[in-house]
Amino acid sequence: MVVGDLHGHMGAAEWLAARALDEPGTHVVALGDYADRGDRQLETLVILLTLMLELPGSFTLLRGNHETRSMASRYGLEDAVLSVHDRAVMDAVHVVFAQLPIAAHRADGVLCLHGGIPSGARTLEELSAVPKGEEEPLDGTAIEVLWNDAEERAGGHGPNWSRGVGRTFGLDASREFMERNGLWLLVRAHQPSAEGFVRLHGGRVVSVFSHPGYLGGATDGAVAIVGMDRTVEPMRIFLGDREAVAGSEPPL
């Protein structure tokens, strides 16, 4: 099970926790962006960190573009933490964020990451070599993995005008990287969609977003179920009334 952006949606995190605990044979990979923007940011983060500790080896948290000090300060997590805890707790959260991996590779050819294929890395080994420990990633490959957007077009990498950081990647970029590294599927997050699940690049790239009603919109949240038989299907997150999310800024 692969989980996209949650952005402080505690209901979706509780939904995920129930399934992770009830189905111990399922390996869960969460793709980052756990807080910021939602109204239950701290609670959502606590649920996810608890699952990571309670289910070692079967619940993996990756780093997204919001797991940095600057994003936490701008989009609300820092305020949420400091409203009930002191600065030392926020500093500890950033230590955890800085140690999260930026990608996860399943041996049968599945790659999971938050944003997208980087322009400066050609192999999985290069992704594995990206240094951890930086509160604000400075490595160009790390920045692109966290920030790149998928576009349904031919071609390779292009400028990311909408975000002003990272790049976009098209079919040629994903196909070249995936064929070189023996991958049949890339699962990534980062971009909201109406149904929370989008197939791109001939079905070899799946984009998943797990916050229902993001920014107050009439959108679903979903996770991706990736089978060992190379099936990939969405599972909708049904919670009844969607939680409203404060703010109207363009998604970052």
Walk through the language-model features, giving the residues of each.
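Feature recognizes metal-dependent phosphohydrolase scaffolds
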Residues: 1-252
